[in-house]
């Protein structure tokens, strides 16, 4: 596993922290697009979902809208 893949959950957390609030959200597709564009990380919907679940397990409050 390369360093970018290891950092992916942190990049997701950073995006959510900087770009979302009660009135603004990011979709998984938008997160995937930004990971590719900004960090050169190609990933799947399931992987991003797993990253979000892991961040929630750490106690980071992330609201998921189905």
Feature annotation, model-predicted:
Residues 1-66:
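Short, basic/aromatic recognition patches that contact phosphate-bearing ligands
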């Amino acid at each position: 596993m390369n360093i970018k893949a290891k950092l992916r959950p942190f990049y997701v957390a950073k995006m959510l922290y900087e770009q979302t609030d009660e009135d603004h959200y990011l979709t998984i597709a938008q997160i995937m697009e930004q990971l590719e564009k900004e960090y050169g990380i190609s990933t799947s919907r399931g992987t991003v979902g797993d990253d979000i679940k892991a961040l929630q397990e750490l106690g980071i409050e992330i609201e998921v809208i189905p």
